[in-house]
Amino acid sequence: MAEHIIVTLDGPAGVGKTTLARNIAEELGIAYMDTGAMFRSIGWKLGNVVESVPPAEIEKKLAGFRFSLSGAGAATQLSLNGTPVGDEIRTEEVALLASAVATLPVVRTFLKKTQQKLGSEVSLVAEGRDMGTVIFPAARYKFFLDATPEERARRRYEQLTAAGETPDLKALTDQIRKRDHQDRSRVVAPLRPADDAIIIDTTELDVQGVFAAIMSKLK
């Protein structure tokens, strides 16, 4: 795609943003930016001491972090300081750490600058919580995906079960509700759709249905 383009996909955990963003980026032949993975990476690196560490100390640590993107579509690779980000960040514990660091202004400021820089360099599909409201408010195409907590927990349950784990559905539902509360009630960049975003409820839709709905708006 010769034209520089940014597509934003926002929404809570478990609505299928990651799969859809990859598929859309693949279809358009542009990069995919997993901003949730960026927050997870920072949470994983900083650990659960974020609440007890002064912002100035966290800022010093962040100064040593460098995110980069390579490739396009489903093959897009996010790296931190030259090392590819892998499955080590895809645990429920790291997810809660990510939500915790997302409340810190120093972290959000750092990632905002990082993400906007990446977006100025390449066309991309950006998925996260505030892509259309804070990071890329001027993006031409903005989407907000949602689904009930129960449906999102069910999807996560199936993912973990397929991976050979033995998750607890009630615990997953409780974790999702907790993350929803953290994400929607935080003072800094709370989870909400942009005023000009197209809102899609994915509760009763499969990935192909949501993909088709989004692509129809991009053509």
Curated annotation (Swiss-Prot):
Q: What's an example GO cellular component term for this entry? A: cytoplasm
Q: Where primarily located?
A: cytoplasm
Q: Which GO terms describe its biological process?
A: pyrimidine nucleotide metabolic process
Q: Which Gene3D superfamilies match?
A: P-loop containing nucleotide triphosphate hydrolases
Question: Which InterPro entries does this entry report, sorted A to Z?
Answer: Cytidylate_kin, Cytidylate_kinase_dom, P-loop_NTPase
Identify the keywords attached in UniProt to this record, alphabetized.
ATP-binding, Cytoplasm, Kinase, Nucleotide-binding, Transferase
SUPFAM superfamilies in alphabetical order: P-loop containing nucleoside triphosphate hydrolases
Q: Which reaction does it catalyse?
A: CMP + ATP = CDP + ADP; dCMP + ATP = dCDP + ADP
Q: Which Pfam families match?
A: Cytidylate_kin
Q: What is its EC number?
A: 2.7.4.25
In which compartments does the protein localize?
A: Cytoplasm
The answer to keyword Repeat applying to this record is: no
GO MF terms here are: ATP binding; CMP kinase activity; dCMP kinase activity
Binding-site residues for ATP, renumbered to this chain: G11, P12, A13, G14, V15, G16, K17, T18, T19
Family listed: Belongs to the cytidylate kinase family. Type 1 subfamily.
Which HAMAP family does the entry mention? Cytidyl_kinase_type1
Query: What's this protein's name?
Result: Cytidylate kinase
